[in-house]
Amino acid sequence: MESPNKMLRVRTQHPIISIVNGVLVDLPAPSNISYYWNFGSLLGLCLVIQLITGIFLAMHYCPDVSLAFDSISHILRDVNHGFMLKYIHANGASLFFLCVYIHMGRGLYYGSYMKMDVWNIGVIIYLVMMLTAFLGYVLPWGQMSFWGATVITNFCSAIPYVGTDVVQWIWGGFSVSNATLNRFFSLHYLFPFLIAGLGVLHILSLHTAGSNNPLGIDSNIDKVTFHVYYTYKDLFGIMVLSSILVILCYFMPNVLGDPENFIQANPLVTPVHIQPEWYFLFAYAILRSIPNKLGGVLAMVFSILVLLLLPFIHTSKLRALTFRPLGKIAFWFLVADFILLTWLGANPVEEPYIMIGQFASLFYFCYFLVLVPLLGWAETTLLRMK
């Protein structure tokens, strides 16, 4: 049996194991972080699950317009445990985005965006995730896949002067075709590895800047080692997430999908209502709330990029919303607004959904551009009053 000293020496001095040790074992972590800090490790788990299931699915998938739909059927019916691979991959993507939204919400609530490098890399990861998920949604080559690809890629035609050329360049022709499916499959296979690389940068920059905590104050004098205090906490979160994923995949595998995608893509028949997956619906609702095409596209893009402005428009002397009652109220209004926009995105483009969507979109941008700086200034002023 090896002595503890030798084990410690290997753990801390080995060129590769020491990196893992610094991330998972001896990492100094604030002593008061809550379960909201679990979602970083859960996102790592989701990414690994998506990579493994995606690689195995790619072994049986055919990126050809005449074979793609049938190859999905082949995976479900003929491949050993193929149905589990497909449903874990599809529902795993939903849980991935759910964890991302909670992770980002925690960052907004506790002011984690003040660590700019960590936050900016996180926003870039989110953008690449959205692109990857969109590319993957096209691959089953069902009706919603085909028409979703047609509608979303057509937004690029709103770019002045070169829009039409850009769309045809993306399509590889004059419509969504075999060339489109091929390049979407190729990029969908590539981007998760890019996300993994950005994830490593995210973790490295986090360890350089140090973790935030629920109080939003410097915690350098009160830290504990990551193992054993938070590894077991993370394991509990992993068990809960795994249980939810297994229940989804076995008992309701298609609950988050669209029935239209059980019909093979037909360029001659348009679905009654075209909509993306649930995790894009808030941005889709913002896009549709503006009647001008270019304006809608800009609003949709800016709804994500506005997150990059947060470190510059934070005016409060307090980082977290823990001790900011006005900021707390505004934040929970934002959460309600996000849920409302998600619901509106799944509804048809008609009244009263259009008008409600316009008000909800207006509040979304007002929160970031008006309420965050205004309430920060107001609360700081009130704190200084004697």
Swiss-Prot record:
Needed co-factor(s): heme b
Major place of residence: mitochondrion
MF term (GO), any: metal ion binding
Cofactor note: Binds 2 heme b groups non-covalently.
Binding site residues for heme b b562: H89, H188
The entry's keywords: Electron transport, Heme, Iron, Membrane, Metal-binding, Mitochondrion, Mitochondrion inner membrane, Respiratory chain, Transmembrane, Transmembrane helix, Transport, Ubiquinone
Top-rank taxon, per record: Eukaryota
Annotated SUPFAM superfamilies: a domain/subunit of cytochrome bc1 complex (Ubiquinol-cytochrome c reductase), Transmembrane di-heme cytochromes
Record field: transmembrane: 39-59, 83-104, 119-139, 184-204, 232-252, 294-314, 326-346, 353-374
Membrane association type: Multi-pass membrane protein
InterPro entries xrefs: Cyt_b/b6_C, Cyt_b/b6_C_sf, Cyt_b/b6_N, Cytb/b6-like_sf, Cytochrome_b, Cytochrome_b_C_euk/bac, Cytochrome_b_N_euk/bac, Di-haem_cyt_TM
BP terms from Gene Ontology: mitochondrial electron transport, ubiquinol to cytochrome c
Gene Ontology CC annotation, any one: mitochondrial inner membrane
List of residues binding a ubiquinone: H207
Annotated positions binding heme b b566: H103, H202
Subcellular location: Mitochondrion inner membrane
Subunit record text: The main subunits of complex b-c1 are: cytochrome b, cytochrome c1 and the Rieske protein.
Function noted in UniProt: Component of the ubiquinol-cytochrome c reductase complex (complex III or cytochrome b-c1 complex) that is part of the mitochondrial respiratory chain. The b-c1 complex mediates electron transfer from ubiquinol to cytochrome c. Contributes to the generation of a proton gradient across the mitochondrial membrane that is then used for ATP synthesis.
Misc. comment: Heme 1 (or BL or b562) is low-potential and absorbs at about 562 nm, and heme 2 (or BH or b566) is high-potential and absorbs at about 566 nm.
Family (UniProt): Belongs to the cytochrome b family.
Protein name in UniProt: Cytochrome b
Natural source organism: Sarcophyton glaucum
